[in-house]
Amino acid sequence: MAISTLKTGRIAIIGASGYGGLQLVKLINEHPDFEISTLNGERSVGKNWNEINPFMKILGDKKITKSNIDEIALDSDYAILSLPNGLSSQLTPLLLKKGVKVLDLSADYRFKSLDKWKEVYTKEAAKYKRYDYDLCEEAIYGFSEEFSSEISKSRLIACPGCYPTASLSLLIPFLKQGLIESEGIIIDAKSGTSGGGRNPSEQLLLSECSESIRPYGVIGHRHTAEIESIASHFAGHQVNLQFTPHLVPMVRGILSTVYARLRDPGLTAEDCKIVIEAFYKDQPFIDILPVGTYPATKWVKNTNKVMISVEVDKRNGRIVLMSVIDNLLKGQAGQAIQNLNIMHGLESDIGLPKITFYP
């Protein structure tokens, strides 16, 4: 019996030359149900993909083109936008009008209020004029494990940021069930250098970041507002928390450690582990580790997994939650494909890696 090779979803990747775009190309090229219809990238217009990326050759090769909405609409069912903040909002309304469903990797539609986005992304708001209040309200936040029903019916997905994905995966089960105090939450997170993108940057030079770790964006990091927005949704009231990111000398990976006060100080680490296991039951990308086993970024490298561990400090009634993700996969392109699978009526884990190469 012949095996069907028909691919049913045509995907345009807009912004294919950055790290996020590279992951998308690899994942879609190897996906059993999707094919790459269009590759857009301002840096390499007119060049063949396989010519400039000999380490990631794709079947049939593709010429990188400028974004043309009419051409994308003719060739594509979905567009995944891996663009700088602000720029996505200039293309998304046009794509949606042409009937192309959009998954946006930027922060442009992560807030239900456009005014809130303008408050957080002030430089981008000054550069790009936006009036798409209705689309901000319509967009579904692409935290796949919690919003899959809404994602399946949506035409516009706002894919979460990398730090929010790692941190919210810990907070949501406990805020939604009222098991932790919403005041005094602290998030300490560490990310590899690929989180800074592919453009040259002095602070990401090997001689600058090797053998060194440093905090950045200590007060007012943009992901603070995103985390607070979603955390408040699940808590049912405003959540104000402390979030501090750190740059560590590795290429990919995020470790997020969350500290919060338990409402019931009698809960044990085993009790809290059961809470997380029940909340994420049957979710293929969430792994809950045994109490006393703490996650390492290498364990999820090159996968779409989230690994979670929990401890309880009986001295002060605090819960300590830990998660690791690959910032370029579960924190970016992998979660986008997970959402794309859901939108297309597939199992969420189709075509996504679950097991790392180790060491």
Swiss-Prot record:
InterPro entries: AGPR_AS, AGPR_type-1, NAD(P)-bd_dom_sf, NAGSA_dehydrogenase, Semialdehyde_DH_NAD-bd. The active site is at 162. It catalyses: N-acetyl-L-glutamate 5-semialdehyde + phosphate + NADP(+) = N-acetyl-L-glutamyl 5-phosphate + NADPH + H(+). Coiled coil: none annotated. Its main location: cytoplasm. GO terms for cellular component: cytoplasm. It holds the Pfam family Semialdhyde_dhC_1. PROSITE patterns: ARGC. It is an enzyme of class 1 (oxidoreductase). One of its GO terms (biological process) is L-arginine biosynthetic process. Pathway: Amino-acid biosynthesis; L-arginine biosynthesis; N(2)-acetyl-L-ornithine from L-glutamate: step 3/4. Its EC number is 1.2.1.38. Belongs to the NAGSA dehydrogenase family. Type 1 subfamily. This is N-acetyl-gamma-glutamyl-phosphate reductase. It comes from Prochlorococcus marinus (strain NATL2A).
